[in-house]
Amino acid sequence: MKLLNEILGTKYPIIQGGMANIATGEFAAACSNAGALGIIGAGGMNADTLRQNIRRCRELTDKPFGVNIMLMHPQADEFAQIVVEEKVAVVTTGAGNPGKYVSMWKAAGIKVIPVVAAAVLARHLEPLGIDAVIAEGTESGGHVGEMTTMALVPQVVDAVSVPVIAAGGIADGRQLAAALALGACGVQVGTCLLASEECPIHPNYKAALLKAGDSDTIVTGRTVGAPVRVLKNRMSRELSLIHISEPTRR
């Protein structure tokens, strides 16, 4: 089995998660320069800012980098074209089926790596010609599925023949080793990079993350079909109570 760094041309078998409103071109470049695959998170951008961030990333690194596209984004079609025009090396996708874009991306030489939360979705996507798949467990930050990383990864490995990348709750070398033992070729990490000097979030947010323990996150939005793992604070607790008391409210 080839490791992820051999597939992507990076130093380490690590992808930086494409976190919306956080993973800018500058942050992605820093991650690529450190030996991972930096990913620009297009989720909080429009078409113009995405293009600007791609070009800024290219100014700051000569290493491979990619773009994450959330397919429910209203400008997903434009994003799909921009990554071709800007000759991005890798596209990761979430929140939808990338099928209508895969042939265009592949023709442009782009590696296509969707994020999945279930083996059935991985099986559905493999015939489209994807290069790998990210199996993301419920331990991850942000939008989550229901299956744990430990349970999900080997099921996806058994379900598809393309390389599988583990994600969700991975923060150190022990968890990377565990992912490889489960059959993954590498890992995607996000939350553990938030406290880095290069990450553009507010220092108070970094301090809260560093202070947080194993019971300091909460998943909101399950009752409205949009589960999201966030830090516990007054707002997330209140939001969780609203979802429980008014489950059909959107």
Predicted regions and their residues:
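Active-site entrance/lid segments in N-terminal catalytic domains of soluble metabolic enzymes
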Residues: M1-P163
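Conserved active-site-proximal phosphate/metal-binding subdomains
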Residues: A151-S161, I165, A171-S245, R249-R250
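Residue-level detector of alpha-helix initiation sites
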Residues: I22, I170-A171
